[in-house]
From Swiss-Prot:
It comes from the Archaea. This is Protein NEQ441. Gene3D superfamilies: Hypothetical protein ph0010, domain 1, Hypothetical protein ph0010, domain 2. Residues 1-180 form the AMMECR1 domain. InterPro entries: AMMECR1, AMMECR1_dom_sf, AMMECR1_domain, AMMECR1_N, AmmeMemoSam_A, Uncharacterised_MJ0810.
Length: 180
């Protein structure tokens, strides 16, 4: 079962003004709580939308539906996806494990605890938070320090906010589904 293909179908239906009803047999397999993000990229790998549900508060089938619709139509960095663009984009879905707070005595320990290619991160301080998926530092060629710094930026905080003991760092893992 390719979740990226289901995400595409959800968006295709929405562009027709319809609600895609995920088949019951698929819903049954995806009826456990999990976070999910949908990433939409152009065929030349430019980001076109990426949004999702970071925490396991909905059944996966519902997180998938929400994330697909948000990535296509609500990502504030991009205009809503248009029907004409469908042939020129690819969908990717990342299913997230529950985020786990990293406990450190010194913020520099984050550099050892975060595993590039395995962990995604959530940076939180006060009302601010930013999430980066596990595949992002690989795609961008970042080390752990750059990953943390860009996580801070994503949260709308200074790039070195991860060095502040008041900043919380969470890690999660992701299972990635891509279109063929």
């Amino acid at each position: 079962m390719n979740l990226a293909k289901i995400a595409r179908k959800i968006v295709e239906y929405a562009l027709e003004g319809k609600d895609y009803e995920i088949p019951d047999e698929i819903k049954e397999k995806l009826n456990y709580k999990a976070g999910a993000f949908t990433t939409i990229k152009t065929l030349d790998n430019q980001l076109r939308g990426c949004m999702g549900i970071p925490y396991p508060i909905y059944p996966l089938w519902q997180s998938l539906k929400y994330s697909a619709l948000m990535a296509a139509f609500e990502d504030p960095r991009f205009p809503p996806l248009q029907k004409e663009e469908l042939d020129n984009v690819k969908f990717e879905v990342t299913v997230l494990t529950p985020p786990r707070k990293l406990i450190v005595n010194n913020p520099l320990e984050y550099l050892e605890k975060i595993k590039i290619g395995k962990h995604g991160i959530i940076i939180k301080r006060g009302p601010y938070s930013g999430l980066l998926l596990p595949q992002v530092p690989i795609e961008e060629g970042w080390d752990a320090k750059e990953f943390l710094s860009y996580g801070c930026l994503k949260a709308g905080l200074p790039m070195d906010c991860w060095l502040d003991p008041k900043t919380e760092v969470y890690v999660f893992e992701g299972q990635i589904f891509e279109e063929d």
